[in-house]
Design a protein with these regions (language model features):
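Short beta-strand segments
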Residues: 1-5, 44, 68-74, 78-80
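Conserved A3 ("GATE") glycine/threonine-rich loop of ANL adenylate-forming enzymes
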Residues: 49, 73-76, 103
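Generic structural signal for well-ordered beta-strand positions
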Residues: 16, 86-87
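ATP-binding/phosphotransfer module of carbohydrate and carboxylate kinases, centering on a glycine-rich
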Residues: 1, 9-12, 30-40, 53-64, ...
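Short glycine-enriched, charge-decorated loop/helix-capping segments at active-site entrances
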Residues: 15-21
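A glycine-rich, Thr/Ser-enriched phosphate-binding loop motif common to dinucleotide/cofactor-binding enzymes
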Residues: 43-53
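Short catalytic helix/loop segments, enriched in acidic residues and glycine
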Residues: 24-25
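Structural signature of FAD isoalloxazine-binding scaffolds in flavoprotein oxidoreductases
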Residues: 92-95
């Protein structure tokens, strides 16, 4: 089995389009079958595969309706509705990262502006952190952000969170802005679909409870009907 970002035609084994990969109508199952000598190869959208895994054996097990939001290079979305993966009639459903949250906003990798992915992916967080470091240098402000780079000396998705834990206020500003956009998107998803569980996966979810403690209060503040109906359980993905 293969899990890939993008619009996936799982019936015909093709990657129809992936904005962060050079694939358009790529017959990945056929190509891999030829290379590996296997006939029974299946491809699915990576977030859909993650959603199904969580529904079967992870944070959403025992439920019939759940959603996963994956935070990595982009923002992915996987839906399990009535115990079935939902991908739309054209396999393009669930592309949560490309819902617009800011009209005319930041440029997204898909070529459009204002997509949620441009604000809530790990890539977006890295960009925001780099911008903050540059601003601090230009204005002579002290910051611990540069003490929290990865082993290669680059900003990562952990940099701002690690510096915030050291008490750095500039890092806290970055994290708070990032979390605001993330919570806005999650609240909108919950208001539309009202799943039993919404789990957060991908690289940024490695922050675990620290991330959830920041996101959940903002989500609850914007959730429609809190206190009047059962609430969607918000959690970190387990798998």
């Amino acid at each position: 089995g293969v899990a890939s970002p993008g619009i996936i035609d799982s019936k015909n084994g093709k990657i129809l389009h992936a904005c962060n990969l050079p694939f358009d109508h790529y017959p990945i199952c056929e190509r891999l079958g030829g290379l590996l000598g296997y006939r029974n190869i299946r491809v699915e959208n990576d977030a859909n595969a993650a959603a199904w895994g969580e529904a079967i054996a992870g944070a959403a097990r025992g439920t019939q309706n759940s959603i996963i939001v994956t935070l990595g290079t982009g923002v992915g979305g996987g839906f399990v509705i009535d115990n079935k993966i939902y991908s739309g009639f054209n396999f393009a459903g669930g592309e949560l990262g490309h819902m617009v949250i800011q009209v005319g906003g930041r440029l997204c990798g898909c070529g459009r502006r204002g997509c949620w992915e441009a604000y809530s992916s790990a890539t977006a967080l890295i960009n925001m952190t780099n911008e903050k470091i540059l601003m601090c240098r230009n204005y002579g402000k002290p910051t611990r952000l540069t003490d929290c780079l990865d082993p290669e000396g680059h900003v990562s998705g952990r940099t701002a969170f690690d510096a915030m834990k050291l008490g750095d206020e500039e890092a806290r500003d970055v994290v708070n802005e990032y979390v605001m956009y993330l919570a806005n998107g999650i609240a909108s998803i919950i208001n539309i679909f009202q799943p039993e569980v919404l789990s957060i996966g991908g690289g940024i979810s490695g922050e675990g409870g620290a991330l959830l403690e920041l996101v959940e209060p903002l989500v609850r503040r914007q959730q429609y009907g809190p206190g009047l109906v059962p609430l969607t359980r918000l959690c970190i993905a387990e798998l």
